[in-house]
Regions:
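Exposed acidic/Ser/Thr-rich ligand/metal-binding surfaces
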Residues: 2-231, 276-277, 419, 487-492, ...
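Long, acidic serine/threonine- and proline-rich intrinsically disordered regions
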Residues: 275-497
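Low-complexity, intrinsically disordered segments enriched in Ser/Thr together with acidic residues
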Residues: 261-278
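Short aromatic-acidic-glycine turn motif
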Residues: 237-245, 290-292
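OB-fold and OB-like beta-barrel modules that bind single-stranded nucleic acids
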Residues: 15-17, 270-272, 281-285
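A structural detector for beta-sheet-dominated domains
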Residues: 6-8, 18, 235, 284-286, ...
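Extracellular adhesion/glycan-binding regions together with long Ser/Thr-
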Residues: 244-264
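Glycine-rich, charged/polar anion/phosphate-binding loops
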Residues: 215-219, 254-257, 268-269
Length: 497
């Protein structure tokens, strides 16, 4: 892991983190990507899948089932799969199942057995993660949780959910946590907060293609983590402009949770205010390849290459754009047009000029598109019917979280918005590495060419050249049936307190 600490202007310091110590950003990305392709991590992916009654609409649950089944073809025998379903109650469907050929059939049967019914009890689902996750330092598997829901948790409170998530993060500090909202009716603020606290990503999906893209991105991310759950310890007077979770420590310092560093991904730049040359900043994480902890104490650089300064300036401006996006969201949803529309419009013009002046990069272009989107929303204001305004609000929440955290897939509108003239491909993330993009593309190809619950001849999976995985045939789906008898997996929990 490489950590470079430098100042971009008076009072503003940047910490640039990357998975390799290679000199330039381009060389680091190429070298790390090659290493990830040659030796991807063995993983344990824990899926928390909402199967409440509303998941039956628009084939939501079927899309998830099809994507999960296609994902099996991407997993190797040393990858493990856990599945927790939840509605009014939660249930461990599968726990720590290695992806051997025989086990794949068992997993397919259990996936196909899921039926939509009941309410949405996320707290119960989180309570069962303890039952399937491996304790820290007992395995070389990279572990991650993916929670998918289409609604609001109507059993338990937001505080219950975040408290339970924080407990999981304390007990299992290496665990990554991604959230996925299906459609526009989910609780964007909650899923965004959970992704921030879990040092993961917040994604929104609206159909089969989106589900495949996001699942591929999350799984590909787990396969290529080089350093897990990286965090920085800063003095109490230091404030971050970035969007990561921050918690006070007993000694008065604070921990900023950056999360995982993927091989082959862009560098992560944390923007800090108030840090001086005399202050101590510690960077901690775990080397996934060795399982050994790593600690760095970077010193403020006196001479900084221009390409490094460019990344720092971009990160600083990005933080300002994310703050602006959240303020526009507050304007759309707040009473009486607060904050002020005229002031926001003026800020948009100034920010657009600031971003345009930056060195041209895919991230800079993305920031310009988001500013244009915000200006459109400011000009049109509230829409009729109100669900369109709610949709825009959720979109801004998710885009701000994705850009602020620097991971995940931007949600797409699929032509639902009357002002949607954005021709950007929503399935291409500027934050994903080649492995993640290949995984997403592979899942999109297999789910698109093999309709779920359609009897047809078995077809080979579309090859994933970058992944170099063993190819397994896609078998015709089986009729829904009761899961195989497995007493240890039939527990349910409706009231976890």
């Amino acid at each position: 892991m490489n950590a470079q600490l430098f100042q971009i202007q008076e009072g503003v310091t940047c910490l640039l983190l990357s998975a390799t110590a290679t000199a330039t950003a381009a060389e680091a990305t190429d070298a790390a990507a090659a290493g990830a392709a040659a030796s991807p991590n063995n993983t344990h992916t824990i899926f928390l899948i909402d199967k409440s009654g509303s998941m039956s609409a628009d084939d939501k649950l079927l899309s998830v089932q099809q994507t999960l089944e296609s994902l099996l073809g991407m997993m190797k025998e040393r990858d493990e799969f856990s599945l927790i379903s939840f509605e009014t109650e939660a249930r461990v469907e599968l726990a720590r199942v290695a992806m051997t050929p025989d086990n794949r059939d068992i997993v397919r049967t259990r996936i196909n057995s899921l039926k939509a019914d009941g309410s949405t009890n996320m707290v119960a689902a989180l309570s069962y993660v303890n039952d399937v996750v491996y304790p820290a330092d007992t395995t070389h598997l990279k572990q991650g949780v993916l929670l998918l829901t289409d609604g609001h948790s109507n059993i338990g409170t937001t505080e219950d959910l975040l408290r339970r998530l924080q407990g999981l993060r304390t007990t299992y500090p290496s665990l990554s946590f991604a959230t996925v909202g299906y459609g526009i009716n989910h609780n964007a603020a909650l899923l965004g907060s959970m992704a921030t606290e879990g040092a993961g990503s917040y994604n929104v999906v609206r159909g089969l293609e989106d589900v495949a893209t996001v699942f591929g991105d999350v799984f590909g991310g787990l396969k290529t983590v080089a350093y897990e759950q990286v965090r920085l310890s800063v003095p109490p007077h230091v404030r971050q402009r970035s969007a990561y979770a921050i918690h006070a420590l007993p000694d008065g310092r604070s921990d900023i949770f950056v999360g995982d560093l993927q091989a082959g991904a862009s560098s992560v730049c944390v923007v800090l205010e108030g840090l001086t040359a005399a202050d101590r900043l510690d960077v901690r994480g775990t080397d996934v390849a060795t399982g050994l902890p790593i600690t760095l104490t970077p010193v403020l650089a006196t001479e900084v290459p221009e390409d490094i300064l460019v990344q720092g300036r971009l990160a600083f401006t990005k933080s300002r754009v994310v703050t602006f996006m959240n303020d526009v969201n507050a304007f759309l949803m707040g009473p009486g047009g607060i904050p002020d529309q005229t002031a926001l419009t003026g800020r948009a013009v100034a920010l657009r000029a600031e971003v345009t002046a930056l060195h041209a990069t895919p991230l800079r272009d993305l920031l310009l598109r988001e500013l244009q989107r915000c200006e459109t929303y400011l000009a049109t204001g509230a829409l009729s019917p109100p669900r369109l305004t709610h949709q825009r609000s959720n979109e801004l929440s998710q885009h701000a979280a994705t850009i602020g955290l620097g991971r995940g897939i931007l949600s797409s509108r699929h032509g639902e918005d009357p002002d949607d003239d954005d021709d950007e491909d929503p399935n291409v993330s500027v934050f994903s590495n080649p492995y993640q993009r290949s995984a997403s593309e592979g899942l999109r190809n297999t789910t698109a060419t093999t309709p779920y619950y359609t009897q047809q001849a078995a077809q080979p999976l579309t090859p994933f050249p970058y992944l170099n995985v063993t190819q397994h045939p896609v078998t015709p789906p089986r009729p829904l049936q009761a899961p195989p008898t497995a007493p240890a997996l039939t527990r349910s929990r409706s009231n976890p307190f």
